[in-house]
């Protein structure tokens, strides 16, 4: 998936060994741990061992969606910049981010909304959210909009990667995804980092972990 030298591979493997040793016991299944371990590798922050929540069907659903060439809808361009375009091309997956579109900016100003909310609404208007992987790494309002669309319009993404970072609504936006079951909503697979921590780097790490897991399974 990546152009990496033997030395680079050795350094990465050594890093993973250190993480495994220092992380100690955990309750994650093997494939789930490969996701969490890659998050820790990207951040050098072992807190993610405790704050990462992975839905029981998240890995399978994410890999199957990739195999089908699902749309990948992101809240910020930084996520797109971090993804491996060649690997996504193998799967036929297209990436989308509308946050800098002129109409999104104008609608946000006119409605006194946020660009993140309007970008998600635009994605929904193009029917890009059903059977998609939705990746939110920066904007809590985008994740809250996804939660609302699930409840009110019944959208069914294949996987939500909900890891927005921040002090305003980041914690609450992630909790809203967990609470969907209380609205008698069919459970949507998710990977979340609870609390304030998260970010685009985390989102990219999760997507790359899923791509690697898919390769290990022989899906591509």
From Swiss-Prot:
> What EC number(s) has UniProt assigned to this enzyme?
5.4.99.60
Q: Which reaction does it catalyse?
A: Co-precorrin-8X = cob(II)yrinate
What is this protein's record name?
Answer: Cobalt-precorrin-8 methylmutase
Which InterPro entries does the record cross-reference, listed alphabetically? Cbl_synth_CobH/CbiC, CobH/CbiC_sf
Q: Which residues bind substrate?
A: 15, 38
| Keyword Isomerase attached | yes
Q: Which GO terms describe its biological process?
A: cobalamin biosynthetic process
Gene Ontology molecular-function annotations? cobalt-precorrin-8 methylmutase activity; precorrin-8X methylmutase activity
Check the record and name the Pfam families matching this protein.
Answer: CbiC
- Residues making up the signal peptide according to the UniProt record: none
What's the family? Belongs to the CobH/CbiC family.
| Subunit structure, as described in the record | Homodimer.
What pathway does the UniProt record associate with this protein? Cofactor biosynthesis; adenosylcobalamin biosynthesis; cob(II)yrinate a,c-diamide from sirohydrochlorin (anaerobic route): step 9/10
Keyword Isomerase annotated: yes
Active site residues per record: 41
Role, per record: Catalyzes the conversion of cobalt-precorrin-8 to cobyrinate.
UniProtKB keywords: Cobalamin biosynthesis, Isomerase
Organism, as annotated: Leptospira interrogans serogroup Icterohaemorrhagiae serovar Lai (strain 56601)
């Amino acid at each position: 998936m990546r152009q990496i030298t033997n030395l680079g591979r050795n350094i990465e493997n050594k890093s993973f060994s250190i993480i495994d040793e220092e992380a100690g016991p955990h309750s994650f299944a093997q494939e789930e741990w490969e996701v969490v371990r890659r998050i820790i590798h990207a951040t050098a922050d072992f807190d993610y061992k405790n704050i990462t929540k992975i839905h029981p069907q998240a890995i399978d659903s994410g890999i199957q969606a990739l195999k089908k060439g699902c749309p990948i809808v992101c809240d910020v361009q930084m996520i797109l910049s971090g993804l491996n375009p060649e690997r996504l091309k193998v799967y036929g997956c297209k990436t989308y981010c509308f946050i800098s579109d002129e109409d999104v900016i104008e609608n946000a100003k006119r409605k006194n909304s946020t660009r993140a909310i309007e970008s998600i609404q635009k994605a929904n208007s193009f029917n890009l959210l059903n059977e998609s992987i939705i990746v939110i790494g920066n904007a809590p309002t985008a994740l809250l909009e996804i939660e609302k669309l699930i409840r009110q319009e019944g959208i069914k993404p294949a996987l939500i990667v909900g890891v927005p970072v921040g002090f305003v609504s980041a914690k609450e936006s992630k909790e809203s995804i967990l609470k969907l079951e209380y609205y008698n909503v069919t459970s949507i697979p998710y990977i979340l980092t609870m609390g304030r921590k998260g970010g685009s780097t985390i989102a990219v790490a999760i997507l790359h972990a899923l791509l690697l897991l898919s390769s290990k399974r022989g899906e591509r």
